[in-house]
């Protein structure tokens, strides 16, 4: 079997297609969660804690060249070591929201699986005719 044929069989299997769809939807869902965190949740958290923009929370760890603006992007471009804990907070909140949503989805799927009626037990198939005849012969020889 040629490599091209093997690859085609592998690529069109249901599991590979399902995985590809899952990755694409997951990427799009990640963008939705990013927007939710950055555009909705973090401004509210910032308002409660007195800061409106968590992305600019940072601690300068080195000397700042003269004339460099005191923004995170400018300091990073200037090569100044900074501890960007605001970005970390945003990413951590992002992760917690995404993990909670996935947890709720898995919980719902498991509940639906438990609610599905169990499949009726399969009835055993009738034995082939030659087996039936052999059993009859065996039983008649025992008598």
From Swiss-Prot:
List the membrane topology term(s).
Answer: Multi-pass membrane protein
CC annotations in GO: plasma membrane
Name its cellular compartments: Cell inner membrane
Keyword terms of this UniProt record: Cell inner membrane, Cell membrane, Ion channel, Ion transport, Membrane, Transmembrane, Transmembrane helix, Transport
Bilayer-spanning residue ranges: 10-30, 40-60, 86-106
Does the record bear Ribosomal protein in its keywords? no
Instruction: Tell me the PROSITE patterns matching this sequence.
Output: MSCL
Top-rank taxon, per record = Bacteria
UniProt cross-references to InterPro entries, sorted A to Z:
Mechanosensitive_channel_CS, MS_channel, MSC/AndL, MscL_channel
Gene Ontology terms for molecular function: mechanosensitive monoatomic ion channel activity
Claim: Calcium is one of the keywords in the record: no
Subunit structure, as described in the record: Homopentamer.
What is stated as this protein's family in its record? Belongs to the MscL family.
Annotated function:
Channel that opens in response to stretch forces in the membrane lipid bilayer. May participate in the regulation of osmotic pressure changes within the cell.
PANTHER family assigned: LARGE-CONDUCTANCE MECHANOSENSITIVE CHANNEL, MECHANOSENSITIVE CHANNEL MSCL
Q: What is this protein called?
A: Large-conductance mechanosensitive channel
From what organism does this protein derive?
A: Paracidovorax citrulli (strain AAC00-1)
């Amino acid at each position: 079997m040629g490599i091209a044929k093997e690859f085609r069989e592998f690529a069109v299997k249901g599991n590979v297609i399902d995985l590809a769809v899952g990755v694409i939807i997951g990427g799009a869902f990640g963008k939705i969660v990013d927007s939710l965190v950055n555009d909705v949740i973090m401004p509210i958290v910032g308002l409660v804690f007195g800061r409106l923009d968590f992305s600019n929370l940072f601690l300068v760890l080195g000397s700042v060249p003269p004339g460099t603006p005191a923004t995170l992007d400018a300091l990073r471009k200037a090569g100044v070591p900074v501890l960007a804990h605001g970005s970390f907070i945003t990413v951590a909140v992002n992760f917690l929201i995404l993990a909670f949503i996935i947890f709720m989805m898995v919980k719902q799927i498991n509940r639906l699986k438990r609610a599905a009626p169990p499949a009726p037990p399969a009835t055993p198939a009738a034995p082939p005719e030659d087996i039936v005849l052999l059993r009859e012969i065996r039983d008649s020889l025992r008598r």
